[in-house]
């Protein structure tokens, strides 16, 4: 029975080990080793079983009956053995461990011989020791599994424990020579822990190599290691074999315990037998001499988690946090106030980083480096030449994208229409010419202001609330320039106050604000809209922004100005003056608006005088074919009437000439109808009128506006049209009469004697157009307020262009006196067209000409 007891005990051990392997999921190689071991045990059992019958043959010869009974008992025992592997043993049950520890008075005890009893007692003692060790191992297994359920991090230690325990028997022979090395390693670990406690800042961030566990990569850690990313620091230990003792079989680290050199994880490792033996030894060492204590393991993992929380952040994360804090403390440094291209962004980034870079003044049109002050705007050479060619050749551009192209340095040549429109909106004009050069100090201050604006705009800039919503970085830059020039300008503007007090002698003036600079300022033009709905005046928000931009640029150029507001209170004029140095905006003051007469405060609050000047000036230049530049080199040619051989009488000949001349004259005047309509749409406030009022103003004021434009080409003998063809005095008398021709020539000669510029002619034409006393107007007061604003703009322009001239104060009343004369010529001209209305069937007139003068047309021309 001892043999059977041994056999059952061996099977119980095998079952227990299989259960342990199932719990911890051993690898296939370890399972194969256990299977081989199980087969060896089965072979030993079979060999002992074969020897057992040979010893019992002598006893069986004495009594055959007893042998038969014993044979039956053996068969019964074999049947029981076949059923034993099917039994589901509990690895932790005392039944499996002590099933055959029967008492001494058992009935089966006397059936064995004394020799076998002695051998069985020795074997039982050995088996008892093994059972105790195995029982302790199973208890540790249960403790570790419970710890894993409580904290998943315990799997790292438990997995290492079970792997080493599974290999304990295979390396039992090699454990004894390695015990001394383990003691040294334990001593080294204690020293490292003491060093870490003394120097927490110099903790070693070491990592064990990855351990394969069911296809997942885990970090096997010891009590001196930390969780975290792999460190590249190669720390040298006092012991030569400090790093080799932590290698695992599946690690990617190089380990050489024989050489004792320390290497970092991830390095190239030579797959040698020494590293494999070292890994096996380290695993077996931990299983044989150090039994896993669940409490110690839990405290170790908790200590490691605490160290992980106290681990300092990487350097890159610290830098990102510092940069974020700097951005919160200095948000203004993150704004770029440079150009709209790559060079400006690079410059602003260099300034933010503290790198000094040479700043430059940008071009107002494309953002390129400005070469100077051209046509009233700081611009580059490319935009200066483009604008000069455009105004000299009068090129008409077209945009394929509805005038919404972006104009920057890289693509400024793609759309000429949008580029020219941006030149106009930036303030480029033939009249906006500077007198003198920019002082050197002003240029230096401009450069300093540009560099400081790139670093961040100061918070002390005074910006109007109306412009803050649409403020552009360039506005901030130029407002900073005027802030730097404030002290210099305060010393210059004082003598100019006396000059502008002469405005008290002017007649009735609307309550608007006037800025009269000592040197010609360059306010920005209002944008010329591409759609008819946006025409008829400058948008108030855009105009304020444009004006703020250019008023500050004018101040930066060394000019200074005086804020003059003439208001009417109780029928008496009052001059409200004050210095205006470094002003951010040109809007009307609140107290001045409240004192305006006849409700003009709304108009004065929406548009400034300079907005009106520049809007009307640009409208005139774009839509008038009689400007100074266009007429300077005009090739003049006479209009010759062909001979009529059919006419038999003088009356018939004169009628033929009159018909032919009207056809020629109307054909050349009709293009001016469309131009004047476009000009009227761009006059500030015109599109706010009702459609009926707009139609009345254009139809009744067309000839008067056209005559104001063409007066430059009228002399005592001829009237020259925009194509160079001229009509003689005799031909004009054929069209009209001698009285009308005399009045027309006198008016033109007088107007030419005043020497008006294109801007002044445009403003005067707008005044003529905005006649509030036309018959049939529904809102004459609204038209009258718009006319007063234009009249004030003309007055300011005259004083500005003729500063110091004695005729400056007399010119505006003279021009206002010419308006009734012009109205009389318009009425006479309308009456002369009655002949065309009566004889419209004899000649073919352009439909637009016939429509604007109420001349009947054929049905096919409607």
From Swiss-Prot:
A zinc finger (NR C4-type) spans 363-383, 399-418. Transmembrane segments: none annotated. Keywords: DNA-binding, Metal-binding, Nucleus, Receptor, Transcription, Transcription regulation, Zinc, Zinc-finger. Residues 47-82 have a biased composition (Acidic residues). Induction: Isoform A and isoform B require ecdysone for activity. Isoform B also requires ecdysone-induced proteins for maximal expression. Residues 626-855 form the NR LBD domain. The keyword Metal-binding applies. This is Ecdysone-induced protein 78C. It comes from Drosophila melanogaster (Fruit fly).
């Amino acid at each position: 029975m001892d043999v059977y007891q041994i056999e059952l005990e061996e099977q119980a051990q095998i079952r227990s080990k299989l259960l342990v392997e199932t719990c911890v999921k051993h690898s296939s190689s370890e399972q194969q080793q256990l299977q081989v071991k199980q087969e060896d045990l089965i072979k030993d059992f079979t060999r002992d079983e074969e020897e057992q019958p040979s010893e019992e043959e002598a006893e069986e010869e004495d009594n055959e009956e007893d042998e038969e009974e014993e044979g039956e008992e053996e068969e019964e025992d074999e049947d029981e053995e076949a059923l034993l592997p099917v039994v589901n043993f509990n690895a932790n049950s005392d039944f499996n461990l002590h099933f055959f520890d029967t008492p001494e008075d058992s009935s089966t005890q006397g059936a064995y011989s004394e020799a076998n009893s002695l051998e069985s007692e020795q074997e039982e003692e050995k088996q008892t020791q093994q059972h105790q060790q195995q029982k302790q191992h199973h208890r540790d297994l249960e403790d570790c599994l419970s710890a894993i359920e409580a904290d998943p991090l315990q799997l790292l230690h438990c997995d290492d424990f079970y792997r080493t325990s599974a290999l304990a028997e295979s390396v039992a022979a090699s454990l004894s020579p390695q015990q001394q090395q383990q003691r040294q390693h334990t001593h080294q670990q204690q020293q490292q822990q003491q060093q870490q406690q003394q120097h927490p800042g110099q903790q070693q961030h070491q990592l064990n190599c990855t351990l394969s566990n069911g296809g997942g990569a885990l970090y096997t850690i010891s009590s001196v290691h930390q969780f975290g990313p792999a460190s590249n620091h190669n720390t040298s230990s006092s012991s030569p074999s400090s790093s080799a003792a932590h290698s695992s079989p599946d690690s990617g680290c190089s380990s050489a315990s024989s050489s004792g050199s320390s290497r970092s994880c991830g390095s190239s490792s030579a797959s040698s037998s020494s590293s494999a033996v070292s890994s096996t030894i380290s695993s077996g060492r931990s299983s044989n001499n150090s039994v896993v204590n669940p409490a110690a393991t839990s405290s170790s993992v908790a200590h490691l988690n605490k160290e992980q929380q106290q681990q300092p952040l990487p350097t890159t994360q610290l830098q990102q946090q510092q940069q974020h804090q700097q951005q919160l403390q200095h948000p203004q440094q993150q704004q770029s106030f440079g150009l709209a291209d790559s060079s400006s962004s690079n410059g602003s980034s260099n300034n933010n980083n503290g790198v000094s870079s040479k700043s430059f003044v940008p071009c107002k049109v494309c953002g390129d480096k400005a070469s100077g002050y051209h046509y009233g705007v700081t611009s580059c050479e490319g935009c200066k030449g483009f604008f000069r060619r455009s105004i000299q050749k009068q090129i008409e551009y077209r945009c394929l994208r509805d005038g919404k192209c972006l104009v920057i340095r890289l693509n400024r040549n793609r759309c000429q229409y949008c580029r020219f429109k941006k030149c106009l909106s930036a303030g480029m004009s033939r009249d906006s010419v500077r007198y003198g050069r920019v002082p050197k100090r002003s240029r230096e201050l401009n450069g300093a202001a540009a560099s400081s604006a790139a670093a961040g705009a100061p918070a002390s800039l005074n910006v109007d609330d109306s412009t803050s919503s649409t403020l552009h970085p360039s506005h901030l830059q130029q407002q900073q320039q005027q802030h730097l020039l404030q002290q210099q300008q305060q010393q210059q503007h004082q003598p100019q106050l006396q000059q502008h007090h002469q405005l008290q002698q002017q007649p009735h003036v609307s309550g608007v604000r006037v800025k009269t600079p000592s040197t010609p300022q360059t306010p920005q033009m209002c944008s010329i809209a591409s759609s008819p709905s946006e025409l008829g005046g400058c948008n108030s928000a855009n105009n304020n922004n444009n004006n703020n931009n250019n008023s500050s640029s004018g101040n930066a150029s060394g000019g200074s100005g005086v804020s003059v507001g003439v208001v009417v209170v109780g029928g008496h004029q009052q001059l409200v003056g004050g210095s205006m140095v470094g002003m951010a905006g040109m809007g009307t003051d609140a107290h001045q608006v409240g004192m305006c007469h006849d409700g003009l405060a709304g108009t004065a609050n929406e548009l400034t005088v300079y907005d009106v000047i520049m809007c009307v000036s640009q409208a005139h230049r774009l839509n008038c074919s009689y400007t100074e530049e266009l007429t300077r080199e005009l090739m003049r040619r006479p209009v010759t009437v062909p001979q009529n051989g059919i006419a038999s009488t003088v009356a018939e000949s004169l009628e033929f000439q009159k018909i032919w001349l009207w056809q020629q004259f109307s054909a050349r005047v009709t293009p001016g109808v469309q131009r004047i309509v476009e000009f009227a749409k761009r006059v500030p406030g015109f599109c706010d009128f009702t459609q009926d009022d707009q139609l009345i103003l254009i139809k009744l004021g067309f000839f008067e506006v056209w005559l104001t434009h063409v007066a430059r080409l009228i002399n005592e003998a001829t009237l020259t049209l925009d194509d160079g063809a001229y009509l003689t005095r005799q031909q004009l008398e054929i069209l009209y009469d001698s009285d009308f021709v005399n009045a027309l020539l006198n008016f033109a000669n007088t107007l030419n004697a005043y020497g008006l510029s294109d801007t002044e002619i445009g403003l005067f034409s707008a005044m003529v157009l905005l006649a509030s006393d036309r018959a049939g107007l529904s809102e004459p007061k609204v038209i009258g307020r718009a006319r007063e604003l234009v009249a004030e703009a003309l007055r300011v322009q005259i004083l500005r262009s003729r500063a110091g001239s004695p005729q400056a104060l007399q010119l505006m009343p003279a021009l206002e006196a010419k308006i009734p004369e012009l109205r009389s010529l318009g009425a006479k001209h309308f009456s002369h067209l009655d002949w065309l209305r009566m004889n419209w069937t004899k000649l073919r007139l352009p439909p637009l000409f016939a429509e604007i003068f109420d001349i009947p047309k054929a049905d096919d021309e409607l």
